[in-house]
Amino acid sequence: MAPDILQAFMTEKTQNAPQSGKVGFISLGCPKALVDSERILTQLRLDGYDVVPTYDDADIVVVNTCGFIDAAKQESLDAIGEAISENGKVIVTGCMGVEADRIRETHPGVLAVSGPHAYEEVVGAVHQYVPPRKEHDPFLDLVPPQGVKLTPRHYAYLKISEGCNHRCTFCIIPSMRGDLVSRPIGDVMDEAKRLVDAGVKEILVISQDTSAYGVDIKYRTGFWQGRPVKTKMQALCEALGEMGVWVRLHYVYPYPHVDDIIPLMAEGKILPYLDIPFQHASPRVLKAMKRPAHDSKTLERIRKWREICPELTIRSTFIVGFPGETEEDFQYLLDWLDEAQLDRVGAFTYSAVEGAPANELEGAVPEEVKEKRLARFMAKQAEISAARLQAKIGRTIDVLIDEVDEEGAIGRSKADAPEIDGMVYLNDETELVPGQIVQAVVEHADEHDLWARLI
């Protein structure tokens, strides 16, 4: 499916206002890339450009690409091709931008190519090909203090660092985004406050490796509102927990100090939710991935986390069919799933990515075997997820409303992140509004979603 151009932010113009340059924008990939798109769009709006929703209305189109796996690269190339065909003036940025030669070879008409988080380069290229109007009046083109956001008004992503110090053999992110660079704690907290002041009810903390926040600067003590705060995940969570909104942690690598976050969840300071990518369970496969290989310790930690915080929701992702994965390894993973009883799980088959060290490993798993293992894996997890959601029937939960139509309201519980987890359906509740937090009793569940009745 071809991506839609995102209509990010529109302002009313006075009848006599000078004509603005008009930019179309396509944002592909993960929430980290979405935050990059928001930053670029914010600067373009500050410079007087309008963001428009169609190719025909745009003077130029920016495509923020994804390069995580080959399928994502192909989607990016297809999006670039569509933008060139429909508009003709295209600037490319994002993770696939590190493969500039391939992009230009496939699409010679591209005007400029830059890599991830190259904000100034992108804005500079837009200025070059569609110069900003000299009569730009910032009072006519007001940008909200929180900047341009591509998410609904009631939730937002908060990126705390860039890059990653790990060298997982299946991943090329460090080659695209570099080593870990943590944002100053004061800057992160200032942005969080702007979001809350703008009405955001849920902050989703993201990075390539959230639990490594501050490692690169030795957990330096920063300052926010006149008080010292360490550049460290626990200190960040404690500070965010004082803001009175939902705080959800994503991309948490299973370092030992993650244990220190669980009491904050039990106390209600941040949401009892961990997005923690385990990737596999077999020690042999994990070693080949260059991931932590202490599966028994991981299970024990999960048990302790749930003892401290019984409401804890654990989401994870896994790769099946990694080079060298035997049937014994895969069965080990299924047995581990049975013990771990994770709440939410995503999985995909291993796919060779250009530049990934895993490509050189022996024991490639046939595609047919990969697909069968994926189906078995997801069937197993569907049983687990269904049972865990069934256990919620009769319980009262908080629901953050995402959308309302003529059939009722759709929201999410504290156990559900946007886009990737389940929904809570409140049938016939047409008077609610997005961003509202309500209490409801769960009446029905399947393996993904809940149906509830408003109290």
From Swiss-Prot:
Say which domain of life the source belongs to: Bacteria
> One Pfam family, short name please?
UPF0004
Decide whether keyword Zinc-finger is in the record: no
* SMART domains, per the entry: Elp3
GO annotations under biological process?
tRNA modification
The family database entries (SUPFAM superfamilies) matched by this protein are listed as: Radical SAM enzymes
What broad class describes the main subcellular location of this protein?
cytoplasm
Q: Which residues bind [4Fe-4S] cluster 2?
A: 164, 168, 171
Question: PROSITE patterns, alphabetically?
Answer: MTTASE_N, MTTASE_RADICAL, RADICAL_SAM, TRAM
Question: Which cofactors are reported in the record for this sequence?
Answer: [4Fe-4S] cluster
Domain MTTase N-terminal positions:
21-131
Known EC number: 2.8.4.4
- Catalytic reaction list: L-aspartate(89)-[ribosomal protein uS12]-hydrogen + (sulfur carrier)-SH + AH2 + 2 S-adenosyl-L-methionine = 3-methylsulfanyl-L-aspartate(89)-[ribosomal protein uS12]-hydrogen + (sulfur carrier)-H + 5'-deoxyadenosine + L-methionine + A + S-adenosyl-L-homocysteine + 2 H(+)
Report the residue ranges that make up the Radical SAM core domain in this protein.
150-387
User: Which sites bind [4Fe-4S] cluster 1?
Assistant: 30, 66, 95
Q: Where in the cell is it found?
A: Cytoplasm
Q: Name one GO molecular function term.
A: 4 iron, 4 sulfur cluster binding
Q: Which residues are in the TRAM domain?
A: 390-455
Q: Which CDD domains match?
A: Radical_SAM
Keyword terms of this UniProt record = 4Fe-4S, Cytoplasm, Iron, Iron-sulfur, Metal-binding, S-adenosyl-L-methionine, Transferase
Cofactor remark from the record: Binds 2 [4Fe-4S] clusters. One cluster is coordinated with 3 cysteines and an exchangeable S-adenosyl-L-methionine.
* InterPro entries per the UniProt record, alphabetical: Elp3/MiaA/NifB-like_rSAM, Methylthiotransferase, Methylthiotransferase_CS, Methylthiotransferase_N, Methylthiotransferase_N_sf, NA-bd_OB-fold, Ribosomal_uS12_MeSTrfase_RimO, rSAM
GO cellular component terms, A-Z: cytosol
- Protein family membership: Belongs to the methylthiotransferase family. RimO subfamily.
What is the stated purpose of this protein?
Catalyzes the methylthiolation of an aspartic acid residue of ribosomal protein uS12.
From the Swiss-Prot or TrEMBL record, give the protein name.
Answer: Ribosomal protein uS12 methylthiotransferase RimO
